[in-house]
């Protein structure tokens, strides 16, 4: 019995609204034409997405690329027909979005280190060092260090760009730095750590085109150029030399692709000057990236934005195909080589080479030496 045709609308909605897996919504829409019309008309895919990730309530409109929907006519039609097309478009987009959030592989989500609130010795102690898993490169320590403060309450923050406009973040891990070259081997952790997720403001400069982007300190630019749509609780950080994982209470959809790590409360002074510092050797972010499927566009002052669909291919299958082709490995290798080059430059800043100037002989000296050689028996 087709209960959609035999039951009243409210009862059918109550039954289908119990589905909490996007795959089940897709299967329901494939049962029959009447079921699909019901699922689309009452936006069941969209409602499930909003139920799972409330941040999506700010989606203002869906944008589809012409290549993906070239079968649809762009000509104007009746109001009813246009409404149906809009609902169909929303159904496709939100069904794909829900599937990606549930089935895309969990991976590292940091694309770049953007800015630190302060840096003690730039660029040797730059935020860029936190992209490296190791706490030393050869014999050279690798870490970010804040400037020193006499008060323990002065906070610090690190800003990162994620690998896509839409990332479902599940966990952030931080490795405080232990200064093995200082007496007592102090660990410069913080009391607490907190995370913010969000996007750039419309009128903010894009750091990708800025000459001072690569890790230079600038707290005011962080505060004025970004909007944070999610703020986590404060997590306690141990003063221990290990990678410490902080799992969010529930996965959070980052809209805009930026993560701010805030360090609250200083615990360790440096013996040399008696000031409090915070030092970090590595930051890692894990989650599901939807960069191959979606892009965020036209974020307004109220946080409303357009959700652009880049491809309707299954996100999980796209990742598997990329892995087989080695594209991800090549990209990761390129990033690794770039970071190694930056580490080398930092090493040269820290340990300048002693270059001995070579004095080239004058041409007259060469001629004199040749004449002496000819004169010898």
UniProtKB/Swiss-Prot annotation:
CDD domains hit by this protein: F-box_SF
Segments forming domain F-box: 7-47
Record-given protein name: F-box protein At4g00755
Superkingdom of this protein's organism: Eukaryota
Native source organism of the sequence: Arabidopsis thaliana
InterPro entries per record: At4g00755-like, F-box-like_dom_sf, F-box_dom
Gene3D superfamilies xref list: 1.20.1280.50
